[in-house]
């Protein structure tokens, strides 16, 4: 297995060295693409909403036609004239999660989704695909982008939201740019927001591998003001006017704090270089969520704020799965047991060799008994991805399993490190 891993790494090094040059195909600007994902549990569709141009590109300028993770959706950009693939990215969405709910069996809905792509120099074809938990195509949509289109909305040239850098290690093209956005903070509460953003930053960089790779990041706190203080709690009939319209009770789950108004997030960030997003909610009620390559959203004043913001960023930044599970429950709608999940920290053993098999010490029992966790810090422990049976995690405990544990397990640390190195070699 070690030989296979070395071969894979050499392949990526070779591919990267012979990949197209960013400047051959792209301007130093961002193409923001807004979509609407619609449908129900039976049928899904994708519709183009709007195209926008942002003043600069903060994303990667290498590994352009490669994916770090499969995700639940993918975007492929091709040069229209040559049909050469010039950019790829992957993602997950709140829409994907909603499709597994009872509500999706009874009604159809639409969800906003926004993605950032490098702005092409020449006409390009964009293809976006949504995948089921079985990795089958649910919906696919193609459209053209003509860079001289006068209806591409120019954003971020003025009326930029006030912001302050908490960490700046270099130009946006040389670092991973994370924006921390205020939600439920009034103009008079922005000093509190900046303090909370500092706390989130401090917590993130107290965890490996973020701590040792801190110089790869820029962190900017964005003071997006809300009319009302706090966030909406529908079960208590509290609806507030806030910057990104977040609320608890997502999918009727008390603690699930999200927003479906994705465009409001990106509108608040227009004109500020960013790739990844953390939203801090001005409330002491426990809750939050993290969606791969979409956003992290968490409450800022609950005692568990610091571990939760790191856990949720593990989802949104590195595509890590939840390692906790419910006794006597198997959620096969989320993770079918005959399909290997794309997340790097759980396995159904369908393709365990693609996960952390190479990290197991010789003699590690497969599966690893729960009472042997002290002897085997890395193993194959049953229970993860919300299911007590059939899904396995790498360690007895981890930041992706409980709030009380102090760090990411070695497998999650490697997964995060690989993502960082993919973005910033």
Go through each PLM region and give its residues:
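Bacterial Sec-dependent N-terminal signal peptides
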Residues: 1-23
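Beta-strand-enriched, solvent-exposed domains that form extended recognition/catalytic surfaces
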Residues: 25-152
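Solvent-exposed loop/turn segments at secondary-structure junctions
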Residues: 184-187, 225-229, 283-287, 303-305, ...
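Short pre-active-site segment immediately N-terminal to the catalytic Zn-binding motif
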Residues: 190-193, 288-312
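Active-site-proximal segments of metallohydrolase catalytic domains
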Residues: 216-292
């Amino acid at each position: 297995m070690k030989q296979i891993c070395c071969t894979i790494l050499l392949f990526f090094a070779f591919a990267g060295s012979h990949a197209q040059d960013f400047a051959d195909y792209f301007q130093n600007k961002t193409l923001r693409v807004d979509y609407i994902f619609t449908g129900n549990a039976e049928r899904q569709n994708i519709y183009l909403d709007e195209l926008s141009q942002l003043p600069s590109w903060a994303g990667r300028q290498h590994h352009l036609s490669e994916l770090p993770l499969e995700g639940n959706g993918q975007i492929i950009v091709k040069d229209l004239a040559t049909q050469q693939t010039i950019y790829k990215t992957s993602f997950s969405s709140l829409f994907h999660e909603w499709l597994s709910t009872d509500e999706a069996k009874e009604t159809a809905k639409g969800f906003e989704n926004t993605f950032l792509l490098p702005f092409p120099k020449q006409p390009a074809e964009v293809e976006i695909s949504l995948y089921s938990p079985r990795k089958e195509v649910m919906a696919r949509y193609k459209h053209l982008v003509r860079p001289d289109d006068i209806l591409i909305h120019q954003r971020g040239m003025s009326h930029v939201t006030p912001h302050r850098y908490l960490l700046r290690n270099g130009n946006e093209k040389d670092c991973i740019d994370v924006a921390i956005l205020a939600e439920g903070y009034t103009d008079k509460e922005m000093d509190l927001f900046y303090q909370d953003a500092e706390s989130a930053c401090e917590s993130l960089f107290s965890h490996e591998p973020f701590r040792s790779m801190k110089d790869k990041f820029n962190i900017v706190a964005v003071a997006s003001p809300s009319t009302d203080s706090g966030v909406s709690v529908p079960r208590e009939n509290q609806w507030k006017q806030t910057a990104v319209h977040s609320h608890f009770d997502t999918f009727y789950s008390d603690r699930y704090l999200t927003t479906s108004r994705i465009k409001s997030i990106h509108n608040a960030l227009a004109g500020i270089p960013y790739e990844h997003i953390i939203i801090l909610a001005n409330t002491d009620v426990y809750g939050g969520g993290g969606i791969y390559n979409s956003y992290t959203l968490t409450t800022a004043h609950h005692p568990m704020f610091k571990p939760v913001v790191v856990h949720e960023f593990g989802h949104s930044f590195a595509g890590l799965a939840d390692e906790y599970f419910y006794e006597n429950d198997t959620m096969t709608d989320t993770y079918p047991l005959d399909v290997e999940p794309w997340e790097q920290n759980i396995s159904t053993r369908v393709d365990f060799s693609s996960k952390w098999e190479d990290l197991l010490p010789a003699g590690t029992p497969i599966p690893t008994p729960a009472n042997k966790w002290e002897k085997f810090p890395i193993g194959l422990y049953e229970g993860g991805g919300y299911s007590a049976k059939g899904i396995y995690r790498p360690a007895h405990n981890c930041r992706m399993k409980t709030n009380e544990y102090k760090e990411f397990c070695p497998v999650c640390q490697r997964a995060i490190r690989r993502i960082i190195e993919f973005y910033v070699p």
